């Protein structure tokens, strides 16, 4: 923590730029987290629901308006009628978006019941009629005989005209559907069906709907809205295209904004990193030029060169990366978790498992490589030392024929550094393939679990897509923090080495009050002077009085 404080202390003069970076990263994270939701909406609303978001039709014919109230309670009818206004022979919805979102929950049951009764397959219709006939003790028609009858024959038997139409089913086959609502209206008008009967039908359908799932329910509601809009003369295909273009345009705008913010953040982070590097170089240079031979011997010239170049470069690089990753990772991670909870996918355990597996992988790799990272800078110092000694004493080496020996010294220092770098790099090469394997494994697991939930009607395809993206964002945020945990210790060591130079004072200290020599005589005098070698416990010279006269 002490090393980290030294690292962060270097950034304090640039706090105002860091605040701007933090705010811009918030904007970038907002855009990044919005894109999966737009993708989900395009799939679920734009493609599956034909661009229709709400279950109440934008426009509906008068006949359909009356049929829609068939399964509504009195309170629901009042609510329904309050948001529609009659224009010619159609009814137009006047509710705003907030009201429509509220009514999606309040009127979902009667709207879905209306949709199912208006689009009942031939098999479901016969089953419903058979159950109704079984409750009549005077009935002599069996279910088997009913199955053999056509819909027209059933209508003749019931003395009613049944409304039928043909449409493609989910398998692309043309099948016959029955609209049972006119029949129910006739039964109500004739007194054959009472409100209690309608309530029983509603309860029966509600039990059936509960087993379908809320996701499928809403899709059925929007399908009803689309059919009503089409009957009222609206171009549903045009509505769908407009929705897709609108959502796609928003996605493009978000992407461009995110790109612009990322460029600005990268520029500002680089400026801060370069500024920190400049300040540290200035401080080190100011200190080193005032060092005596004692301090130069303590650090060695090679080490000072490494600290002034490689160590500062390390801090400069980590500072820029840290302002991009260390600040961004928590924002995107927390935002991703919030968005995941909003999807209602109930697969948070997959994210927890992925994070734990990645943590285990990173901890294993870190435990192997971190000790090597710590000695890396010392090995760079050793290589610089040997290189400088060879270059400085090149003429002496040639004079005494020690070229072979010096080559061996350099090769040894070079091999030590190379072996360490190769070891760390080889170990760390397992990280990215391991991460990719985990991420793709998590994606497959999400798709597998989601497939069962989609089949049960508890999840939509778009929500699954959004959940996968949010999961990847959370995992990547954790991965960013992990990568920083690798970089920060090395930068912390570099900061400690630089701070060691900056905090070292020269052993030659001038008096605060300097004496001005008016007359230069060239005479040197020692009065009660003591001397000891650096690090020694005792003085080797004590209480020395000495006078050196000019020319003597």
Language model features with spans:
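A short amphipathic helical element positioned immediately N-terminal to and/or at the very start
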Residues: 1-15, 304, 308
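ABC transporter TMD-NBD coupling linker
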Residues: 42, 49, 392, 408, ...
């Amino acid at each position: 923590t002490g090393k980290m404080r030294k690292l962060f202390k270097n950034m304090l003069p640039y706090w105002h730029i860091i605040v701007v970076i933090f705010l811009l990263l918030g904007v970038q994270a907002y855009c990044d987290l919005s894109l999966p939701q737009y993708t989900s909406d395009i799939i679920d609303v734009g493609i599956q629901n034909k661009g229709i978001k709400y279950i109440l039709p934008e426009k509906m014919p008068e006949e359909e308006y009356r049929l829609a109230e068939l399964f509504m309670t009195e309170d629901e009818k009042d609510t329904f009628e309050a948001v529609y206004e009659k224009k010619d022979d159609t009814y137009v919805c006047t509710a705003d978006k907030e009201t429509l979102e509220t009514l999606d929950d309040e009127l979902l049951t009667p709207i879905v019941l209306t949709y199912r009764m208006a689009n009942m397959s031939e098999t479901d219709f016969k089953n419903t009629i058979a159950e109704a006939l079984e409750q009549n003790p005077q009935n002599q028609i069996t279910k088997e005989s009913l199955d053999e009858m056509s819909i027209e024959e059933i209508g003749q038997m019931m003395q009613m005209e049944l409304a039928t139409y043909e449409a493609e089913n989910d398998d692309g086959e043309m099948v016959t559907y029955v609209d049972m609502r006119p029949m129910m209206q006739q039964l109500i008008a004739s007194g054959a069906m009472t409100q209690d009967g309608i309530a029983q039908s509603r309860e029966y359908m509600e039990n059936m709907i509960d087993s379908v799932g809320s996701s499928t329910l809403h899709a059925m509601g929007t399908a009803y809205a689309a059919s009503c809009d089409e009957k009222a003369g609206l171009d549903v295909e045009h509505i769908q295209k407009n929705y897709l273009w609108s959502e796609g345009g928003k996605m493009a705008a978000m992407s461009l904004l995110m790109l612009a913010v990322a460029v600005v953040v990268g520029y500002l982070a680089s400026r801060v990193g370069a500024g920190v590097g400049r300040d540290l170089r200035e401080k080190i240079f100011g200190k080193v030029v005032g060092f005596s031979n004692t301090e130069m011997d303590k650090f060695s010239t090679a080490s000072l060169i490494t600290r002034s170049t490689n160590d500062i470069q390390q801090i400069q690089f980590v500072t820029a990366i840290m302002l991009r990753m260390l600040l961004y990772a928590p924002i995107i991670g927390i935002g991703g978790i919030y968005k995941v909870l909003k999807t209602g996918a109930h697969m948070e355990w997959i994210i927890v498992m992925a994070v734990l597996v990645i943590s285990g992988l990173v901890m294993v790799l870190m435990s192997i490589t971190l000790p090597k990272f710590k000695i890396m800078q010392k090995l760079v110092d050793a290589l610089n030392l040997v290189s400088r000694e060879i270059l400085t004493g090149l003429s002496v080496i040639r004079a005494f024929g020690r070229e072979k020996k010096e080559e061996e010294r350099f090769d040894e220092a070079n091999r030590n550094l190379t072996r360490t770098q190769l070891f760390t790099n080889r170990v760390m090469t397992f990280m990215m393939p391991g991460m990719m394997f985990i991420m793709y494994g998590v994606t497959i697991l999400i798709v597998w679990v989601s497939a069962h939930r989609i089949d049960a009607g508890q999840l939509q395809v778009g929500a699954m897509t959004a959940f996968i993206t949010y999961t990847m964002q959370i995992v990547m945020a954790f991965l960013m923090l992990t990568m920083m945990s690798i970089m920060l210790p090395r930068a912390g060591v570099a900061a400690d080495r630089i701070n060691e130079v900056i905090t070292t004072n020269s052993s030659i200290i001038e008096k605060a009050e300097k004496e001005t020599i008016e007359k230069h005589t060239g005479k040197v005098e020692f009065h009660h002077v003591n001397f000891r070698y650096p690090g020694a416990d005792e003085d080797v010279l004590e209480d020395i009085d000495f006078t050196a006269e000019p020319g003597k």
